[in-house]
Amino acid sequence: MLKITLKKSLIGRRPNQVKTAHALGLRKIGQSVSKVENDAINGMINTIGHLVVVEKE
């Protein structure tokens, strides 16, 4: 399991980055979600890696 926390704002980001964050369930700064680690989630993290902090649970 991965704990993904949004650390930076989505304001002014490219639309694909905003949609990726929303697809992960991240909408507000400081919000965290737990996801199972797989290729799809890892690709999403690569897209918005500079906006989030990822921890292994």
Curated annotation (Swiss-Prot):
One of its GO terms (biological process) is translation. Gene3D superfamilies: Ribosomal protein L30, ferredoxin-like fold domain. One of its GO terms (molecular function) is structural constituent of ribosome. Keywords: Ribonucleoprotein, Ribosomal protein. It comes from the Bacteria. The keyword Ribosomal protein applies. It holds the Pfam family Ribosomal_L30. GO terms for cellular component: cytosolic large ribosomal subunit. Part of the 50S ribosomal subunit. NCBIfam families: rpmD_bact (TIGR01308). PANTHER family: LARGE RIBOSOMAL SUBUNIT PROTEIN UL30M (PTHR15892:SF2), MITOCHONDRIAL RIBOSOMAL PROTEIN L30 (PTHR15892). Belongs to the universal ribosomal protein uL30 family. This is Large ribosomal subunit protein uL30. The gene is rpmD.
